Amino acid sequence: MRILGLDPGLARVGYGVLEVDEQRRNQPEMVDCGIISTDAGRGEGERMVEIARDLRQLLRLHRPDLAAVEKFFFYRSSNTIAVVQARGVLIMTLARFQIPTVEYPPMQIKLALAGSGHADKGEVQDAVMRELRLNERPKPDDAADALAVGLTAWFQR
């Protein structure tokens, strides 16, 4: 099974691709991680188009069986609204590719990985490193967060 974890953002969307041999019930392995970045000099609409285009390329390259996306329940600022709009672009693009999608709020991701819904970013990143048997924390932070979302999907299956 191949899982794509996504950490939504307007400037940067983190992504992490995990592979798991379900027959053997193996630990997930990281296939790829990184970011989709958009040009801050462009308008929001153009940036959303960039996100959709780059996500389509990732989907064609990695062919995930499942996608997991971080979900937000509250809006504190106009910047948060842009992130939620970018999240909508991700969800729409995944639907167009008919990829089953699950969503998790930040507290559930923290609880699944670090054992506490109030864990800090470092604790979650250390858990990602441990679960994937990595020698160092994945960089940038957005990619590490996306791997955490993907791992949550595996743990919650």
Swiss-Prot record:
Source organism, top-level taxon: Bacteria
Transmembrane intervals: none
Record keywords: Cytoplasm, DNA damage, DNA recombination, DNA repair, DNA-binding, Endonuclease, Hydrolase, Magnesium, Metal-binding, Nuclease
Active site annotation, chain numbering: D7, E70, D142
GO molecular function annotations of the record: crossover junction DNA endonuclease activity; DNA binding; magnesium ion binding
Residues at which Mg(2+) 2 binds: E70
Record-listed E.C. numbers: 3.1.21.10
Pfam family, any one: RuvC
Subunit structure: Homodimer which binds Holliday junction (HJ) DNA. The HJ becomes 2-fold symmetrical on binding to RuvC with unstacked arms; it has a different conformation from HJ DNA in complex with RuvA. In the full resolvosome a probable DNA-RuvA(4)-RuvB(12)-RuvC(2) complex forms which resolves the HJ.
GO cellular component: cytoplasm; Holliday junction resolvase complex
Keyword Transferase: no
Locations listed in the record: Cytoplasm
Biological-process GO terms, alphabetical: DNA recombination; DNA repair
The protein's required cofactors: Mg(2+)
Descriptive protein name: Crossover junction endodeoxyribonuclease RuvC
Record PANTHER family: CROSSOVER JUNCTION ENDODEOXYRIBONUCLEASE RUVC
Source organism of the structure: Synechococcus sp. (strain RCC307)
Reactions the enzyme catalyzes: Endonucleolytic cleavage at a junction such as a reciprocal single-stranded crossover between two homologous DNA duplexes (Holliday junction)
